[in-house]
Each structure stands twice: as C-alpha cells, then as structure tokens.
C-alpha cells in the first residue's frame, strides 16, 4: 500500500502551485507584442546557411564569377589601316600578284578577286566578301582615308631624279649609246634637208617676184630649219660664231618665207 500511494502523492500538486496557474495578470496586447517578428524567424536559417557555407571551418566565402561579354570586332578605320589591313595588301600585291596580260583577262580577273578575298577573310572573317567590300567602300569616303590614299598615290608615282629637278640636262650615256645617238641625229638632219630642198623646188614663183627671192638664201633657210630637229647635245657643240645671221637677216628670211607661203596659197 505504501508503494502504491507514493507515486500518486508525487503527481499531485500543492494548493499554492495550483493557485499560481490561475492567478495571472497578462493582457492580450502584451502577448502579441512579445510574438517573434518575421525577421527574427529568418535569423536561424541565415545562421544555418553560414554554418553550412564553411565559415565556421575557416574557409572563404564562395565568390560568384560573372562572365564578361567579349567585345565584338568591327571593321573600322583603325583595323583597315593596321598592318593586316591595306599596308599588307600593298606589300603582298607588289610581291605576289602577277598578271599574264592580253588573252588572259578572265584568269587575271579571277586571280585578282581571289587575292582580295583571301586578304579580306584574314582581316575580318565575320563578314562575307560582298559585305566586307561594301563596308570598306563606306569607310573610303572618310576624310582620313582619302588623305592617306592621296599619300599612297604620290608614293607610287615615278620620282624625278635630283639632277632633272635641279635643271641639269646632263645625262651620262655609254660611249656606244652616244655614237648611235649622234649617227641617228645626223641621219635625221640629212633626211630633213632633202625634204626641205624638195619642197622648195616645188614652189611656183611668178615672174613678178622672181627677183625678190635670192637662191643664195635657200641653204640658210634649210640650215635654220635643220637646227629645229637637232638634239640638245649636238646644238650645244655648235660654235657660237658659226656665221649665224643677225636680227635684220632673220627678219628678211622670215619675210621671204611668208611671201613664199602666200604665193603658194594664192595660186
């Protein structure tokens, strides 16, 4: 009996304890004010997340890497004027581009188009050949490219030697070339003199002006016309006092020549 009554007495509460259960002064507002907020409810989750991330183990927090977008290549003035651009086109064209000439126009045009296509594909692979040519044509209207193009054209022009620019006509030729040149000039003079004599012999001079024309002046006229076809070297070798007529004699010769021309045109 004693054993059975012990647990029962242990479970029964004291009268004071029972009174405390029903003796409270606690309002509804105080109860709602002590309710945990929503942010407080998330704190345990955040701490759990940090604990799972490995911060408690001394590990660094995971860094999120965002991939940067690669810049898109453009066919602009800078790319066109760079070394793979037009400068490379000019170098390779001088060294590799050869044409066969007449009778091979079609193959030469195909070779030229293939050359341009390979160059443009290496410069800007993103564009097709026709599209790339259209872009290059639009860029060619810019002031910068027009200025550089003029410079390239001036570079390709044949340069005049410094001797010619200084006004010196002296040209050093081999001895054989000078001999051939002298013989050719002499032959031209003889041919011109013969033609002049033939033309003068065909002139019809009326009787009224027969005395005004002196046959002794015909060699002088022939010699004067002959000098027009002389080379500069031969003319420079002539002596200054070779019996050249003075101004009055030149005027007389010119008047006689005009009279001859007028007579032939009137007849």
From Swiss-Prot:
The keyword NADP does not apply. InterPro entries: Csm3, TIPIN/Csm3/Swi3. Coiled coil: none annotated. It is found in: Nucleus. One of its GO terms (molecular function) is DNA binding. Keywords: Cell cycle, DNA damage, DNA repair, DNA replication inhibitor, Meiosis, Nucleus. GO terms for cellular component: replication fork protection complex. The keyword Cell cycle applies. GO terms for biological process: DNA repair; DNA replication checkpoint signaling; meiotic cell cycle; replication fork arrest; replication fork processing. It holds the Pfam family Swi3. Belongs to the CSM3 family. Forms a fork protection complex (FPC) with tof1 and which is required for chromosome segregation during meiosis and DNA damage repair. FPC coordinates leading and lagging strand synthesis and moves with the replication fork. FPC stabilizes replication forks in a configuration that is recognized by replication checkpoint sensors. Component of the fork protection complex (FPC) consisting of tof1 and csm3. PANTHER family: TIMELESS INTERACTING-RELATED, TIMELESS-INTERACTING PROTEIN. This is Chromosome segregation in meiosis protein 3.
């Amino acid at each position: 009996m004693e054993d059975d009554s012990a647990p029962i007495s242990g479970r029964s509460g004291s009268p004071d304890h029972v009174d405390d259960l029903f003796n409270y002064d606690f309002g509804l507002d105080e109860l709602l004010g002590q309710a945990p907020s929503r942010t407080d409810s998330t704190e345990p989750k955040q701490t759990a997340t940090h604990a799972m991330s490995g911060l408690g183990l001394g590990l660094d927090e995971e860094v999120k890497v965002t991939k940067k977008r690669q810049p898109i290549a453009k066919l602009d003035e800078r790319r066109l004027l760079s070394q793979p651009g037009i400068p490379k086109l000019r170098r390779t064209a001088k060294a590799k581009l050869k044409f066969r000439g007449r009778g091979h126009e079609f193959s030469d045009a195909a070779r030229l188009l293939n050359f341009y296509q390979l160059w443009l594909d290496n410069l800007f692979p993103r564009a097709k050949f026709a599209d790339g040519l259209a872009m290059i044509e639009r860029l060619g209207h810019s002031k910068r490219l027009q200025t550089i193009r003029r410079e390239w054209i001036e570079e390709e022009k044949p340069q005049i030697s410094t001797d010619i620019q200084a006004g010196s006509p002296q040209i050093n030729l081999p001895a054989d070339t000078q001999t051939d040149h002298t013989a050719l000039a002499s032959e031209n003079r003889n041919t011109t003199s013969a033609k002049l004599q033939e033309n003068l012999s065909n002139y019809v001079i009326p009787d009224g002006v027969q005395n005004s024309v002196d046959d002794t002046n015909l060699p002088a006229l022939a010699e004067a016309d002959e000098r027009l076809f002389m080379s500069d070297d031969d003319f420079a070798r002539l002596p200054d006092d070779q019996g050249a007529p003075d101004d009055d004699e030149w005027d007389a010769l010119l008047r006689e020549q005009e009279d001859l021309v007028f007579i032939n045109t009137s007849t």
